[in-house]
Amino acid sequence: MVIDHPIFLESIRFIRSHLIANDLNYLEKKVLERLVHTSGDFSVQNLLNFSEGACEKGLQALKNGAPILTDTDMAAAAIKTMAENTTRNKVFTAGMWFGKNNHTNLTKTAYGLSEGWKELSAINSGSKSPIVVIGSSPTALTYLIDILENAKDLPSLIIGMPVGFIGVENSKNKLISTDLPRIVLNSTRGGAAMAAAAVNALLRETI
């Protein structure tokens, strides 16, 4: 059960009264509201990119018990409380697979996320396929897209919001160029808090 503080509710009402993204559907607006609230910046509404039906697919996966795989502990921590208070989806981080890295040409996060995806998707397929949340590592996002190119099972949703200057926009553009279900924050902006906020917006809609 989620009990919102009056200040949070007042903030959301304020945000809604100032949004101009009229082309978004109900769930997309919910995600946008949370991202504006998290960032304190209305310009976010000009940066969001949704693939068609991405929010609906992600919401259904959460209701079905899909696990959530993040690239950082910070993103996982920001999601866990909401997950525990709603559908109790299990939250995993790439760091859980760091110790198995024998590939020196990959970053720890890229390796951990890809191995985590392989393991979790093997036991959670179809309507329970994992949701992947990336708020830090563009390298992990790029590598994930590469290994999914010929994969049989695909994520229910990818939150692509790595932050930074090197490789970030390229990784996001690469995700947008695919048919993968996605929510992307264009530009160099992003981060664990923003990526987690997108997931939490959908988790709120499960109750």
PLM feature spans:
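Short active-site oxyanion
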Residues: 63-68, 129-131, 155-156
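Buried hydrophobic positions in well-ordered alpha/beta secondary-structure cores of metabolic enzymes
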Residues: 71, 159-160, 198
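Conserved mixed alpha/beta catalytic, RNA-binding, or beta-rich assembly cores of soluble enzyme
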Residues: 72-151, 162-164, 168
